[in-house]
Amino acid sequence: MNRLTLEEFKEAEKLPLIVVLDDVRSLYNVGSVFRSCDAFRVEAVYLCGITATPPNAEIHKTALGGEDSVDWDYFKTTEEAVEKLKQKGYFVYSIEQVEGSTKLQNLPEAHEELFKQEKESEKQGNESEKQESSSLPKGYAVIFGNEVKGVKQNIVDMSDGCLEIPQFGTKHSLNVSVTAGIVVWEFTKLLKL
């Protein structure tokens, strides 16, 4: 296996994706998300509200050191995190089952639509206008909500869009860390490190 050292990981190119945890209460879920983010070299994890932060033995138990390799930041509120992401030029998705959400399997088409809009913008303007009005994001951010309440409605409203994982059984929810692993993998395929 080609495992990176911690130093090599810190220097390696990252997937332009930031994972945001919105009031995730389980320390084991937080650790598991860090572990998945390490596996796919995610740019950073933003921990918000009641979400616990490293160093923490329970987070470490499931993260297996992922909390040391993946950059992270803490925000008192998820609103602050979303505002920062938008200022930095990220396209923000809430992962939530809401009317009008994009099915995760349709993410490539949604991504392609951003590029299509950018190409149309290029045809209509000069170089300086392109830079000012670029519709291409610097990267993506995905927000995962509380295990019981999901992503708060005001955060959904602040987001650029919503993604959901279609489900076909008797339950209409997945564990937040499982959901994060699935979504991060889809972005890994889309953005190709």
Please annotate each region the language model reported.
Residues 2-100, 188:
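RNA substrate-binding interface of SAM-dependent RNA methyltransferases
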Residues 81, 85-88, 151-161:
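A structural motif corresponding to the C-terminal end of an alpha-helix
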Residues 153-193:
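Structured adenosyl-cofactor binding patch, chiefly the S-adenosyl-L-methionine
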Residues 105-138:
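Intrinsically disordered, low-complexity terminal tails and inter-domain linkers enriched
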Residues 54-59, 149-155:
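Short, glycine/polar-rich helix-capping loops at beta-to-alpha or helix-loop-helix junctions
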Residues 36-38, 110-111, 158-161:
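Glycine-rich, phosphate-binding/catalytic loops in enzymes
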Residues 98-100, 147-150, 168-170:
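Short Gly/Pro-enriched loop/turn and capping motifs at secondary-structure junctions
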